[in-house]
Curated annotation (Swiss-Prot):
Domain RdRp catalytic stretches: 1454-1565
Disulfide-bond pairs as recorded: 434-481
Organism encoding this protein: Hepatitis E virus genotype 1 (isolate Human/Burma)
Binding site for ATP: 975-982
Region (Putative protease): 442-509
Activity control summary: Putative protease: Inhibited by chymostatin.
A cellular component term, taken from the record's GO annotations: host cell perinuclear region of cytoplasm
Catalytic activities: RNA(n) + a ribonucleoside 5'-triphosphate = RNA(n+1) + diphosphate; GTP + S-adenosyl-L-methionine = N(7)-methyl-GTP + S-adenosyl-L-homocysteine
Alphabetic keyword roster: ATP-binding, Disulfide bond, Helicase, Host cytoplasm, Hydrolase, Magnesium, Metal-binding, Methyltransferase, Nucleotide-binding, Nucleotidyltransferase, Protease, RNA-binding, RNA-directed RNA polymerase, Thiol protease, Transferase, Viral RNA replication, Zinc
Region (NTPase/helicase) location: 960-1204
Sequence ranges of Low complexity compositional bias: 754-768
All residue ranges annotated as the Macro domain in the record: 775-921
Name of the molecule in the record: Non-structural polyprotein pORF1
Enzyme Commission no: 2.1.1.-, 2.7.7.-, 3.4.-.-, 3.6.4.-
Amino acid sequence: MEAHQFIKAPGITTAIEQAALAAANSALANAVVVRPFLSHQQIEILINLMQPRQLVFRPEVFWNHPIQRVIHNELELYCRARSGRCLEIGAHPRSINDNPNVVHRCFLRPVGRDVQRWYTAPTRGPAANCRRSALRGLPAADRTYCLDGFSGCNFPAETGIALYSLHDMSPSDVAEAMFRHGMTRLYAALHLPPEVLLPPGTYRTASYLLIHDGRRVVVTYEGDTSAGYNHDVSNLRSWIRTTKVTGDHPLVIERVRAIGCHFVLLLTAAPEPSPMPYVPYPRSTEVYVRSIFGPGGTPSLFPTSCSTKSTFHAVPAHIWDRLMLFGATLDDQAFCCSRLMTYLRGISYKVTVGTLVANEGWNASEDALTAVITAAYLTICHQRYLRTQAISKGMRRLEREHAQKFITRLYSWLFEKSGRDYIPGRQLEFYAQCRRWLSAGFHLDPRVLVFDESAPCHCRTAIRKALSKFCCFMKWLGQECTCFLQPAEGAVGDQGHDNEAYEGSDVDPAESAISDISGSYVVPGTALQPLYQALDLPAEIVARAGRLTATVKVSQVDGRIDCETLLGNKTFRTSFVDGAVLETNGPERHNLSFDASQSTMAAGPFSLTYAASAAGLEVRYVAAGLDHRAVFAPGVSPRSAPGEVTAFCSALYRFNREAQRHSLIGNLWFHPEGLIGLFAPFSPGHVWESANPFCGESTLYTRTWSEVDAVSSPARPDLGFMSEPSIPSRAATPTLAAPLPPPAPDPSPPPSAPALAEPASGATAGAPAITHQTARHRRLLFTYPDGSKVFAGSLFESTCTWLVNASNVDHRPGGGLCHAFYQRYPASFDAASFVMRDGAAAYTLTPRPIIHAVAPDYRLEHNPKRLEAAYRETCSRLGTAAYPLLGTGIYQVPIGPSFDAWERNHRPGDELYLPELAARWFEANRPTRPTLTITEDVARTANLAIELDSATDVGRACAGCRVTPGVVQYQFTAGVPGSGKSRSITQADVDVVVVPTRELRNAWRRRGFAAFTPHTAARVTQGRRVVIDEAPSLPPHLLLLHMQRAATVHLLGDPNQIPAIDFEHAGLVPAIRPDLGPTSWWHVTHRWPADVCELIRGAYPMIQTTSRVLRSLFWGEPAVGQKLVFTQAAKPANPGSVTVHEAQGATYTETTIIATADARGLIQSSRAHAIVALTRHTEKCVIIDAPGLLREVGISDAIVNNFFLAGGEIGHQRPSVIPRGNPDANVDTLAAFPPSCQISAFHQLAEELGHRPVPVAAVLPPCPELEQGLLYLPQELTTCDSVVTFELTDIVHCRMAAPSQRKAVLSTLVGRYGGRTKLYNASHSDVRDSLARFIPAIGPVQVTTCELYELVEAMVEKGQDGSAVLELDLCNRDVSRITFFQKDCNKFTTGETIAHGKVGQGISAWSKTFCALFGPWFRAIEKAILALLPQGVFYGDAFDDTVFSAAVAAAKASMVFENDFSEFDSTQNNFSLGLECAIMEECGMPQWLIRLYHLIRSAWILQAPKESLRGFWKKHSGEPGTLLWNTVWNMAVITHCYDFRDFQVAAFKGDDSIVLCSEYRQSPGAAVLIAGCGLKLKVDFRPIGLYAGVVVAPGLGALPDVVRFAGRLTEKNWGPGPERAEQLRLAVSDFLRKLTNVAQMCVDVVSRVYGVSPGLVHNLIGMLQAVADGKAHFTESVKPVLDLTNSILCRVE
């Protein structure tokens, strides 16, 4: 039934209070700070004037005009923020030094009061020149100011501001002055009181006293201690009435800001001013009442500035309105003047009841009271007269109308029809009055005044107009017009070249001269010692640099500086251009910012300026707090000793490498010429020129190769250590040395080039004679089963057919091993002799077979795929090859990845040569062949099974065979079905093949192998080389028998397929089934079609297929090909069929899978049967699944059909799995925390947080009022009164709520999803542009079967199957059903745990059909977003915790900006949904799918077990893409609403977000978005923050939140079964694992962020240690449920 209208909301008061508190906090955060000391009356005036702005009073200064100055400062901030670089008119002297954005100031020569202002002006800075010129009558010292006034100056500027300096100029004068300046916009602050529109008099309002004598007006505010404003009345009236200026200098005047009668006018030059009527005083609080009897003679004994009394009196509007309402509604008999006087006296008293002002009152003079009573009485009398006359005349008119005859009525009907402009009663015209009549009124209300007047500019006089017409006439006659009256078009002043504020100037800006510093300079290292110390260089390098002197030759051309640095016997070249990339020793990138006109350079924290001087080149260095100047004399220095230079270079290289290994972010890579050079520490475009062509950049810091060394020590171990060369040197090509004799070829050389036809006979004719080397120093480390070997030693000792060189991309000579190859085989680098290329690798046969392989440069980018390809490209050959570890030298590829890549990509018989460092690594990580240990129990059970088997006819061959305890070594090649495991076996590798079935035996025998079934093979496997195919499906006792009897055993099979079945049900098979670990996995299948691969990718995550068949699975079609059934009982009903177990290992072109009802238990208990059935075909498979058995294990057509319907494609994408690792116990500080008492730890936690034991187990919160939607609930709301819990402590630190109660579900439904949604209709472009800071434009996204597999895998992991995925039929309710569940966990809090007034949390689950429809798209969009995230931005959980912690630790000088949304899901509306749809459209999602998503999200029904809610908008936590779109919306709000300074790291997950920066501020467009969407942001900015269960401490890292984790344990029920206690132990153990290395740091940081003692955190860690050891103590308690929902009323209908 519908009952939402009967639900009261006692909790609404709390919600209103919270909303009011949030509004107050927001207002205070944006309040105006009032600094002067004020009286109580001044405070009231200021509060009323500044409404609705919040004021914060911090009195600290005394001001002469406090009210005006506060208003002035506020309007000044507004004007300066919008004007930018501008011209200022009449600037106050005290503001000159504070506003550098002003390019010119116009002053008048000081007279009177202005002289006093100049005497108190600052005497330093720019104000000093202005002060000196103003007081001494001197001309302006520079062009930043003038003393000619605004109208007498012509300095060009596009924008100007005038703060209370235009009161003595009319709008027309200002328009002409703006034209002379070329100004298009002028912000003018003016004081325009409405009293200037009235006749002369003295007017007193609540804020000020105004004296008006008809010519001048003087205004003095309350509390002023000096004279007030004094302005010309006619000008003020012009500014109030004028909205535009016409003539030759047109402009429009718009009031853009007002505080009381202080206005900011925006004057904009416009060619055609349009009407702009405006109401100047809509918030006026005074009404001006006219005095009937004007004053006569002298008003007082003492003369004043005004010779007359006021003819109008300012009366509070509320007094006049109440008086008129009272008098107009009095009875005729009761109306009299005395009664009006009595009422006026009553409402003139101020009445206050407590803090409530019941009557504001009015403190009036006797003249004002007399005038008000007189005016009110006469006005009411006149109105009563009008009322009487109107009724009387109206009655007579009615009598005449109804007495008309037919002819008169017909005449009126024919000739007096009403038109469109007819208004009933308007044509009667009972009464008309004149403006000067007494009946015209006695008061003026400024609230209804409307002005729209235009003022003509003064340049168009009558004579000027006549002469202009005459000129035009002369032009018409063809005469030259010499009219001097025409205004100068485009007058922009005579000095526009040096004015940056004027953008429309036609004068080209003058370019500053660039000083030329070309020449030769001497750079001693001693001159740069302070810089070295600021760079934190080691003392050794500083000392060595101090002993060196360099000569730097500088050439400067077109903003580019080229330097040639001569340091000892080495020459370096650098090129300085703007934007040049600087080499770094970490992932951070630096670009050089170079401005030749300003002679500055900067990059990162380093900057310098240079200038030519008489003494040479003067350079100023700024780095790390250092400000150092050095002067380098011109000339040439003597050369430094080569040994000293080499030692310096080597020490510098070691320092760079050390910094590279230990730095997370990195710094500049310091080159020699970067430290001993003019522009230290920059060295862009670094090139070292060497006379030796073999000594490239890589040998700058190492020993240079020499021909003598190569000849005398051909087997030098370190020849193969360095893998890659760098950029080859620019030196000229020298004379080539004779190659050394290479090793002898293989006894059986390859007949042809690799993968090529037979080469020409002369291909190797030029090769020298090949002889064996006499000395062999290599050491064998390991031999693989395929014959491959790993050696420690030199590559050139190998006798393999091919040698592999670590080359560069251009295959040119370089350093390291490449240099050694060039010394021995220089002809091998001739590109013309390359016989083949495979990818980046090049093959050559001259002078011997060599492969030039190219590894990736890990200094630039980590590219594992390229590393794999580097080895794979060397396998297109015949014969064996000798490899180095590619990339582990100069390119800095780690040893492990390079070795693993070689293991996966080599051919049998190949050799790998390791240097000593890599050899030591290999010996520590030596691969071992797996072993199987047969225990006595296993042997005894296997022998029992053999005895039982030997008693049968099949197993007679096993009689007498026994399994003995021992260790068996084996090789197990596992792979996906159809991967070619069997085809990889050759007859030369095996003597006997053992297979489980006759079909497989026959297949092997057809290939020429001696194949046997398991039982008969017992006679022939003794001492033979045995291959066991489909090993996991062999009976385990026979498998153990053959493995133990064979000389070598090679297992083939798939661990995921059907294992051995215990047909006898004796229990022996599972008892002795061995645990075999594959030694290698093959993931490429040549059998499976693409859809099969994706459907069962959950069992084979890395599977790939070579099949070109995209879709092969079909439902509901006739049977084709081989029929497969699951049970023997189904075979008679399907003639020609075989069971899946019998078909294992077989391959068919077409198959039909028939699932019968008797196979339900088999399929549910063994998903392997379904996998085998699906993987037997190569082209087509028809599934006949009447009982729906395969659908129950996730195999159905609905998922596939919906996937292709949504635009999915078959293909491969990057998997969404993020690699994670467990931290090593390198600093095991957790071991110092012994287990502690659980009770004491929780009691100390309660004491610190202020929580106390509570007598209730749960709370039913009040149900809020349903504001939108329809609620349906059952007639009975039954609840339980108590709850039984197994708890760790009786003190709970979470918000308590009852998850299982019907009333709790009801309150959660209404509270979370029944509130009013604030809609916001606006364009998404601004928010999307802001979001582009974190998520750039995404572009089309491809949805592939990889995302479909991940979706199916996630469903299977959650225990779901495909039965809930239906065909997309929107008429079916099950397709679009959204179910709702109450969440059983609550949020940790340090505040109130019971009386929090918060409703529970819920989970809304979309239908599995919609999840399968949208899920792949959202996964693909998420991958695209992750690929585009900038450095330092972390999304959701898609990162390793150690990476995030390292990024936080690197941001040492940052603060933590932390935001927490309130009601994040509830406030999402049409705008956030529109942003989601806009991003979906940007990614290429089909339009019908976007519209369907918008429809589902905009109107929905949440279906709880017994309740339902029909609502609109909001966000549901269980819908697909919840984390994705919540995180995107969070990113959009944060980046649109806030600007961050020194941004370092940002992390977003759902509604949680942090940003590490030095400062933040709210962006200009934030208020519009926050107010439009009703967002509730709770921002905190502190040194340490909280985010997603971790404590974020800049400079230290992300640390586990011990207090929060321990607090959440107190709320859960850990019973009644032991499995809950085990879950607790595992969860605590996982959490403690994160504390392994940071436990002590957590104690210090977590205690600080929560404000608790470090001893508490220490005690909590000890308590968690005890729980992880299984020593947790649980207490069973029975507590009542606190029901606060008594206000829920239910009506039975």
